[in-house]
Amino acid sequence: MDFSGIAGKLTADAGVSADNFLYVALYISFVNSFLEEFFFRGFAFISLKKITSRGFAYVFSAVLFALYHAGMTAGYFNFGVFAITLGGLTVAGVIFNFLNEKSENIYTSWLVHMFANFAINTVGFILFGMI
């Protein structure tokens, strides 16, 4: 897998560069993760669980979460990596749902999601040669 082209592709496709990556990383980690948890867990899981079956709410919100994220990475990797990513993100969605089912709020999964984004953004800092 060629990681060297990812930074260039991010710059060309999304305007993300070493000059603005710190701000992008902070936004992704704090704001975007909250918005995602609000939608995928607060709406698509907790609210949906009240009007449908528990199993449907688990699967629907987890798969929706995975498709949203995998869609952002389409074109960066081959199909095998894409499929593994889709599976891993679905499992992550199920885990986030489980965390929120216990607390009946989105704050637990938001915290975990934030730390996952910190880890992913660390890779971004490396790819952009910032650390």
Describe the function of each predicted region.
Residues 57-70:
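Small-polar-interrupted transmembrane alpha-helices in polytopic inner-membrane proteins
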Residues 1-33, 50, 130-131:
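Juxtamembrane helix-loop-helix connectors linking adjacent transmembrane helices
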Residues 15-24, 44, 69-77:
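Short juxtamembrane and helix-loop transition motifs at transmembrane-helix boundaries
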Residues 29-34, 66, 85-89:
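Residue-level hotspots within the lipid-embedded alpha helices of multi-pass solute transporters
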Residues 35-60, 101-105:
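Membrane-interface helix/loop boundary segments of multi-pass membrane proteins
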Residues 34-39, 43-44, 67, 71, ...:
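Active-site His/Glu-centered metal-binding helix of metallohydrolases
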Residues 59, 79-131:
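Functionally important transmembrane alpha-helices
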Residues 2-6, 70-77, 81, 125-130:
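Transmembrane helix-loop junctions in multipass membrane proteins, especially transporters and channels
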